[in-house]
């Protein structure tokens, strides 16, 4: 089908090439043979009067013209999918929808397991593809490659709608047999004990406690670096090390690992886990249904107001006379990516 001289099928080809950045993978994703894909690329180049892609090894590198086309083409295809192809009504009991959700393993364990159980009852054919957090999460949302992003709200972009899910705070965890971990941890003890620290690939956004230390020119003693909060408890077992973890996750691991929870000697701000979705999914019935379930289940974990008040009370009662501890209360939120 042509529209003002453009074969509209070529827009699907262009979108697949921008996503896969590989000719063979793009052809496979839209069920075209490689010769047919090569012919489609030639037609795209002829229509737009631009190379669109150059080869670097086996990777397709888009030209500035291709980059400028990527977003409007993707938006047009998504609008067609959501407004024309998709049915007006969404029936959860009959739907076979698969939701692609980017989230941490921490949130998967403490929150999303309940979502899976709920959906299995209400919509048995609905499925999920849970993906790790990536640095380009904003781009994934923009292109509609994920349906939802769940992560701490301060790290989210302002380019997409979002909703708060539940409040969380960081605590210090250690093995129950750790004799060097007192019931009231001082700042000096915190800095001197060997730590298991989390460092994600999101290099431009340091963790909350890391940001505090960086702001004050401080460096803690790190024995082991892991890529996930869930890897901290095994590294603490039978050792004198400590680790900083979300309270709910420590409570989860406490059932199977001998852990002890101690308040941090830092007045770190509590944070909110939030859900974000592409703006063009705002009116999508399936997305609305899923958002309602996320919000309903998150409400069972306690309101953000209650969590914030609990944290404020706890921190104020545990503040030390150390001026660094007092300054930590002035810690700014991490910058949005």
UniProtKB/Swiss-Prot annotation:
Residue ranges of every copy of the HTH lysR-type domain listed in the record: 6-63
PROSITE patterns listed in its UniProt record: HTH_LYSR
Domain of life: Bacteria
Keyword terms, alphabetized: Activator, DNA-binding, Nodulation, Repressor, Transcription, Transcription regulation
Pfam families to which the protein is assigned, alphabetical: HTH_1, LysR_substrate
Molecular-function GO term, any one: DNA binding
DNA-binding region range list: 23-42
Xref: PANTHER family: HTH-TYPE TRANSCRIPTIONAL REGULATOR LEUO, HTH-TYPE TRANSCRIPTIONAL REGULATOR LEUO-RELATED
Family the entry assigns: Belongs to the LysR transcriptional regulatory family.
Function field: NodD regulates the expression of the nodABCFE genes which encode other nodulation proteins. NodD is also a negative regulator of its own expression. Binds flavonoids as inducers.
Miscellaneous note of the record: There are at least two nodD genes in B.sp strain NC92.
Record-given protein name: Nodulation protein D 2
Annotated source species: Bradyrhizobium sp. (strain NC92)
């Amino acid at each position: 089908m042509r529209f003002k001289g453009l074969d509209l099928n070529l827009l699907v080809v262009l979108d697949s090439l921008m996503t896969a950045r590989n000719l063979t993978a793009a052809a496979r994703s839209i069920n075209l043979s490689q010769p047919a894909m090569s012919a489609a690329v030639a037609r795209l180049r002829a229509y737009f009067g631009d190379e669109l892609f150059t080869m670097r090894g086996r990777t397709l590198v888009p030209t500035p013209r291709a980059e400028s086309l990527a977003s409007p083409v993707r938006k047009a295809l998504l609008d067609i999918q959501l407004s024309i192809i998709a049915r007006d009504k969404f029936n959860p009991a009959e739907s076979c929808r698969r939701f692609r959700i980017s989230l941490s393993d921490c949130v998967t364990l403490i929150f999303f397991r309940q979502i899976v159980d709920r959906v299995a009852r209400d919509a048995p054919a609905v499925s999920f593809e849970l993906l790790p957090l990536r640095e380009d999460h904003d781009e994934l949302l923009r292109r509609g490659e994920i349906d939802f992003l769940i992560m701490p709200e301060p790290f989210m972009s302002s380019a997409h709608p979002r909703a708060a899910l539940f409040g969380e705070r960081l605590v210090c965890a250690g093995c129950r047999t750790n004799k060097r971990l007192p019931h009231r941890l001082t700042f000096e003890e915190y800095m001197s004990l060997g730590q298991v620290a989390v460092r994600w690939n999101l290099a431009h956004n340091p963790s909350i406690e890391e940001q505090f230390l960086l702001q004050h020119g401080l460096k803690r003693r790190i024995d082991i670096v892991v890529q996930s909060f869930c890897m901290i408890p095994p590294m603490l077992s039978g050792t004198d090390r400590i680790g900083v973890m979300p309270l709910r996750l420590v409570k989860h691991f406490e059932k199977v690992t001998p852990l002890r929870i101690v308040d941090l000697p830092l007045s770190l701000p509590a944070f909110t886990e939030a859900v974000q979705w592409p703006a063009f999914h705002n009116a999508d019935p399936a997305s609305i249904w899923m958002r309602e379930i996320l919000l309903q289940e998150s409400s069972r974990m306690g309101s953000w107001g209650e969590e914030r008040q609990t944290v404020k009370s706890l921190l104020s009662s545990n503040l030390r006379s150390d001026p660094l501890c007092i300054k930590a209360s002035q810690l700014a939120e991490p910058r949005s990516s």
